[in-house]
């Protein structure tokens, strides 16, 4: 049964009697269109060989939360059915702090295109085991983000942003960068740094055992971060420097290899006008997200 959710009392009644409930909320191009120019002006720009600008349709969101009607619908349906999932349609992170602990499941569908409905159904019915990971961190509270306003004409993005800013300020987030769940679970063990001593022109080699400890076949994105705690300059706590996706059957364990050239750990020295590699001890973190609770830890040195 399809219901638009505008009548909250009716929506509750429908949800209580249903076998499963799918609550679709989120945004459209009118909310996140970034002032897209019209098709007509796209054609004119192509013919003229230059961009013909206009304000266009849609812009930036005015709030980090869902719109009021969506939030009210979620709160109204929370607790009505144990088989309820909130499906979020949108292109960026949202503040879910007032409702995420009140619903059994949340699925980010993003802007999935013409076959998005088919893809969503396949995930919900278990034909596909989701394996996506968040490309950003989501804070516990909107106040944890830098100052936000959709009305400014210009804005400055500092060196630290995203998960590196949260790490630097020691702020625990609600959903870390690289986080993502599936219908199974994965375990990490036996982290080995195969190149504990490296020259600046060397390559860091790491291996880790990854196991599917659930009952369903699935895919996991194994992530490797490098830490810079011993740096003589101001650097992030850690940065993602390699990742690998591995498919595992229930009970299966595989050894996953990750590598990163040392030159990719360099920093740009504006005074010398060159990239430089620090000779020091580095940390290695490997796991299923950027959250330190999910990471195995090792180390290596560049001489």
Specify the residue positions occupied by each region the protein language model found.
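C-terminal non-catalytic regions of proteins with extracellular/luminal or membrane-system context
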Residues: 1-303
């Amino acid at each position: 049964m399809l219901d638009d959710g505008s009548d909250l009392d009716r929506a509750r009644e429908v949800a209580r009697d249903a076998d499963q409930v799918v609550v679709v909320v989120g945004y459209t191009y009118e909310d996140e269109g970034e002032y897209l120019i019209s098709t007509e002006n796209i054609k004119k720009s192509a013919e003229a060989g230059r961009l013909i600008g206009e304000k266009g349709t849609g812009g930036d969101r005015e709030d980090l939360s869902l719109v009021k009607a969506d939030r009210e619908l979620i709160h109204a349906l929370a607790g009505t059915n144990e088989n309820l999932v909130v499906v979020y349609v949108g292109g960026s992170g949202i503040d879910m702090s007032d409702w995420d602990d009140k619903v059994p499941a949340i699925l980010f569908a993003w802007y999935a295109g013409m076959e998005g409905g088919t893809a969503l159904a396949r995930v919900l019915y278990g034909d596909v085991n989701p394996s996506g990971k968040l490309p950003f961190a989501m804070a516990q509270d909107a106040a944890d983000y830098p100052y936000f306003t959709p009305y400014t004409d210009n804005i400055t993005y500092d060196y630290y942003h995203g998960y590196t800013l949260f790490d630097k300020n020691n702020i625990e987030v609600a959903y870390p960068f690289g986080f993502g769940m599936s219908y199974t679970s994965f375990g990490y063990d036996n982290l080995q740094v195969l190149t504990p001593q490296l020259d600046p022109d060397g390559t860091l080699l790491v291996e880790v055992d990854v196991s599917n400890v659930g009952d369903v076949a699935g895919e996991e994105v194994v992530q490797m971060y490098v830490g810079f705690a011993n740096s003589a300059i101001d650097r992030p706590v850690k940065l993602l420097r390699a990742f690998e996706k591995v498919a595992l059957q229930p009970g299966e364990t595989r050894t996953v290899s990750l590598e990163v050239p040392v030159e990719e750990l360099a920093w740009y020295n504006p005074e010398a006008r060159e990239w430089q590699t620090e000779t020091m001890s580095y940390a290695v973190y490997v796991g299923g997200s950027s959250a330190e609770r999910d990471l195995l830890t090792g180390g290596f040195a560049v001489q």
